Amino acid sequence: MKEAYHKLRVFFPGKKFNLLILNVVGLFTVSLFEMLGVAAVLPIVNLAMGAPIEGYLKQVAELFGNPDRTTLIIIFGVVLVLAFILKGAFSLIIKRWSLGFVATQQSTTSVNLLNRYMREPYLAHRKRGTANILVSINDYAHQAYAAFVNGVLNFIGELLSIAVLMVMLLVIMPIPALLAFSYFGLVSYGLQHILRKKNREQGVIVVEATRGATNATIDAVDGFREIRMHNVTDRYLYRYQTKRMDSVNASMRSTFLQDFPKYSLEIIFIIGIAGLLAFMSITSGTQSAPYLLLFCGACIRILPSYVRMVASLGNVRAGEKASNELLREISELDEQGRKLQMPPAPVAPKNPEYINKTIAPVRIQLENLTFSYPDSDSPVLKNINLDIPMGTSVAFVGGSGSGKTTLIDLILGLFAPSSGRVLRNGEPVQDDLPGWFQSIGYVPQDVFIADSTVREAVAFGLEPHESDEERVRYCLEIAELTEVVESLDEGIMTMIGHNAVRLSGGQRQRLGIARALYRNPSVLIMDEATSALDNETEHKITKAIEKISKDITVIIVAHRLSTVRHVDQLVYLSHGEIVSCGTFTEVQQQNEEFANLVRLGQLPE
């Protein structure tokens, strides 16, 4: 119970937990109406059987002006009917509100999780698999709220109904009520002892199988070409089928375990009630008929609540694993968010100054830059010192594993240095990452393109009505994409599919270049951004970028040496250190490894 309370406090933070308490108060009110309706049975039966009007009957009669017996029966009948009408109406209202409230909070939790994932440090993000994120924000959240939270609320509601009716029976007929309470308590304990472990097991299987099925789906979709070419489609289908069937079978077993009490308890209940009625008849004789009827009425009302209560416990057990995983994710990300002072998820997207009105010249300095991954003792980069003047171009060259991409991630601000600083006009970029990001146009080797139009792909993150069509066309022209786009069915409004499947690899890279230029950046960073281009197209784009403005600082990572032939500075990296720096010709003369690369590339001097 304490654990469930803690989870509810986390799943419904702040004032939302107060609303949850209000929901419980509403459930208690419904229980009182039900008790009032059931309690009204006793005076009706007593009056109908000619019992003397005394005690509480006399008090009620005096309240209504001492009416005759028939009128009193009608009064209690109206109370009974009104009590059940109000109980039904309140139940519907509370149920509708409760379902909406829980569903809304489930959605809010999923959004907050994604917000945390999107704002966490890049290093932490790299450790998470896509499947784990999808399972957390979708499946864990759904199972935790739909099964665990709703299960707890339903359990509380049914428990209150049973408790109120049992209190009424204890007041009116204590011994039979105690016997009934003991009997059903033992039955409940026995059932839960049998079903608890099995419900938890099925919940664990559902969680693990769902994660496996999601992984299998992502692998199958992302690896489509290789899977088809290697003729292993059946294997990937089998992996997905196995996990999906595990999940379906576990869900089926969980549902069966939740329904099992419904059928078994009916039999157990009838046997128990029959025994108690026989006991009351023997010990009290015919005078106990009204009380027997009341007892039967109360028990008939208790049975469905009792069945639903036990089933709700099964739901809670089934959702326990998902709720534990969700709690762990929320706690971990919230702690991370507090440390990094992450903002909450926005209610609506902001409209930022997406296009920089002017290019603000940027000087970049790397001071004693060292970086190690948290799980490694060996630094990837060691004592990097470099000055990149405003409006100049620099290229990072080196073999695989030399640290080029890590250095770019540090300059971008995605990684924080282990020691040293990246300075923007003399100020550490880590002190104002949003401002730094705003000034950068970044083109990775593998450009991310959502299922969108050409216009949306260039004006990344903006709605069509928010983007500048004239600037979109201008950037497409610089990226040598005008003819390609005009050949499409709907021009810049053509849907190009996820990862721009309608375009070639080179065209996707050019689309990435157009996107980076759309923001009118002060710094353009190109990480193998022209690797899929032919020499002629690459040359045209390079010349076009040079003509845009001499104020842009350009940083290039490339293996193809033709890309970096005319940069102002060429930096050769080896084993995480700068071993040579200068013009292309100077580095060629200083460094034998680079000179050998030039010879292998057959580049003219």
Task: Describe the residue ranges of each PLM region.
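Juxtamembrane loop-to-helix connectors within ABC transporter transmembrane domains
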Residues: 118-163, 222, 246, 260
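ABC ATPase nucleotide-binding domain helical subdomain, centered on the C-loop/LSGGQ "ABC signature"
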Residues: 423, 430, 437, 455-498, ...
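Transmembrane helices of ABC transporter permease
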Residues: 23-29, 153-205, 275-289
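Helix-to-loop junction immediately C-terminal to a conserved catalytic motif
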Residues: 412
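Transmembrane helix-loop-helix hairpins at lipid-water interfaces of multipass membrane proteins
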Residues: 23-86, 170-175, 182, 285-289
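ABC-family ATPase nucleotide-binding domain "signature/switch" substructure
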Residues: 441, 446, 457, 475-478, ...
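Cytosolic ends of transmembrane helices, especially the final helix of ABC transmembrane type-1 domains
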Residues: 228-232, 256, 301-334, 338-342
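Hydrophobic alpha-helical segments in the permease module
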Residues: 80-87, 184-186, 262-265, 269, ...
